[in-house]
């Protein structure tokens, strides 16, 4: 732990009084740190394993700071020996005590922020997987070429998908324009599950660990439903501000394919049957 104290004291110019590991942190070590004048979260990993990961996270946090959500402030960022690190303000997570209404309001306003293209000016990460964000004019092109195809290839190379699965995905791509309604690009969190929405000391919903890009807004909502639930109050408030297209819940599985492929890549075969079920449903 000495190198961690060295980093903190180098950047904060104060002696560390408290240092403890936080829950979570599958990819990075995450630690809570206190000095006389600072209360921060330190995220740290090996720079060679995840090149520029914290650069990308910082870019995402800055982009999300234009939304109504509270976003952790970036205090310091850099490298030390073999380590890459990001120092953020510490937000004491109160769990899910934020109001469902406020979550719906903030999501609708975030998704109202738009761009001329789907994607982002630079690539980033989702979890530990590099995420390609090359700009596209249509969501269909972006979703197929930048989201599904790269992960399908990785899973095939890992022997987690076979040639039969690949053929079914190729058939699915031909059906997507009949299933997904056209919409303008929306600013997305990109990795929106309940663990990345925390409640601050004022019970305000706060976003962490982004994988941002401009995409179809049903991506964020579909991911929330995949690994949790969305209250009726959240959806009602969202719809009052930015009404969703009809039958959006019926096609969430199409947009859940991407996070399921991410999990198949990272965690293995328990995610294969849900993927095969969705692809088979539409082909």
Residue ranges and their predicted role:
Residues 20-137, 141:
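ATP-binding pocket architecture of kinase catalytic cores
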Residues 132-133, 139-144, 153, 184-187, ...:
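Active-site Asp-x-Gly
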Residues 68, 111-118, 155, 180, ...:
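A general structural signal marking secondary-structure boundaries and capping sites
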Residues 12-20:
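Conserved N-terminal boundary motif of the eukaryotic protein kinase catalytic domain
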Residues 254-262:
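Short helix/strand-capping connector loops at secondary-structure junctions
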Residues 1-10, 115-187:
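An alpha-helical support segment within catalytic cores of ATP-dependent transferases
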Residues 263-283:
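ATP/Mg2+ or Mg2+-diphosphate-binding catalytic cores
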Residues 15, 36-40, 204:
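Short acidic/polar mixed-charge low-complexity motifs
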């Amino acid at each position: 732990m000495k190198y961690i104290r060295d980093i903190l004291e180098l950047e904060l110019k104060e002696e560390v009084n408290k240092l403890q590991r936080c829950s979570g942190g599958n990819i990075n070590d995450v630690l809570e740190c206190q000095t006389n004048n600072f209360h921060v979260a330190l995220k740290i990993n090996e720079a060679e394993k995840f090149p520029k990961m914290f650069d990308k996270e910082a870019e995402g946090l800055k982009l999300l700071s234009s939304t109504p959500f509270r976003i952790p402030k970036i205090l310091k960022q850099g490298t030390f020996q073999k380590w890459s690190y990001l120092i953020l303000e510490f937000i004491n997570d109160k769990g899910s005590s934020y109001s469902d209404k406020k979550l719906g309001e903030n999501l609708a306003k975030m998704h109202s922020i738009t761009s001329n293209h789907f994607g982002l000016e630079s690539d980033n990460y989702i979890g530990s997987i590099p995420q390609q964000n090359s700009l596209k004019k249509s969501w269909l092109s972006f979703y197929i070429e930048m989201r599904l195809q790269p992960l399908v290839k990785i899973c095939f190379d890992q022997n987690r998908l076979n040639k039969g699965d690949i053929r079914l995905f190729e058939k699915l791509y031909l059906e997507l324009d009949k299933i997904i309604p056209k919409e303008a690009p929306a600013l997305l969190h990109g990795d929106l599950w309940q663990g990345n929405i925390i409640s601050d000391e004022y019970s305000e919903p706060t976003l962490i660990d982004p994988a941002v890009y401009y995409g179809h807004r049903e991506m964020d909502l579909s991911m929330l439903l995949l690994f949790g639930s969305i209250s009726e109050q959240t959806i009602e408030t969202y719809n009052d501000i930015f009404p969703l297209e009809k039958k959006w819940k019926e096609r969430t599985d199409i947009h859940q394919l991407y996070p399921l492929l991410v999990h198949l890549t990272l965690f293995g075969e328990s995610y294969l049957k849900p993927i095969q079920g969705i692809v088979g449903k539409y082909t």
